[in-house]
Amino acid sequence: MTESLTMAALYGKLSKIGLKKDYVRKNGLPSWWDDELNDKPVAVLEGAGYIAKNLNLDLSSLLTPQEKVKFNRPPHTKFKQHNSQNNQHPHLAQALASRFAELIYLGVEVNYTPLPKDAKTIREDILSHWPKVDLTSLLDYCWSQGIAVGYFDHFPNKTKKFAGLIQWYSTCPVIILSSKYQQSARLAFNLAHELGHLALAHLNNGVLVDEEITFDNDREEKEANQFATELLLGDCDNCLGDRKFPNTEKFSIYVQEHFISHHPDIDIGAIILNYGWHNNYFALAMATLKVLEPNPNGNKIINEYLANKLDWDKFDDETYEYLEKVLGV
């Protein structure tokens, strides 16, 4: 089988499932790989092993010439999507993120403590240790409960992505966030939404994929959204009402002076997003967040927290390098 094995042949097979050569070279192979090895069958066999491991592929299907490359079989998966008429699920994104989730599970020592079903109970717990409920305090709470959290966006170009994913393992759930919006407040809502799925027992095993987190007619999604709102805002859902603001500056000043001054335990980004959703002024809300957080780094906050929780000694050199790359640390 190895006599005619070339990297060009593997690249050709992988491109058919959406994994182009540049992506595979950057994310599947270790940095020490030299293109002089591309036509040496024994070396290519070793390279195929790295590709399969990093990209969650079935190695046998990658090596068998006439067989289509397959991803490793995922656990039972529940997809949550905004458009129920769209049956194009983000399978490629799920496969890549699931490998990331698996590495997180292998690299941390946590044991899950079931969550209270009442969001306000969790909110009170967080506020007993932190001044407000925001992305950082939510991360601290998740890890204290044995819930590992990571952010992943190392996908091939034009890949159908997802907002959030929960993957269960024997001792803990792993949450992966992947929203293109990296504002801390957006990611905090997405994380609170996934906590809602866990607390309300929408998933007890396997995988749940939130393709897009919106206000829609799916019962479980509505419940998770309500849970997230109560967790972030307490009793202040829609507290800004239907006031009109001409621009981001006046909006942010009003919220600071007339709301946050009276509710210091609420993150300003959370109430701004809440206003945008209730009044269909989402563009104004997002523009205001950009003023308040001109260089959004919610993804880095998540992965820096994760990097400090990982036992890096558990990984071989190539996996260590891959994790550094996808974590951005």
Mark where each language-model region is.
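Active-site hotspot residues in diverse enzymes, especially metal/ion-binding acidic/histidine motifs
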Residues: M1-L191, G196-V329
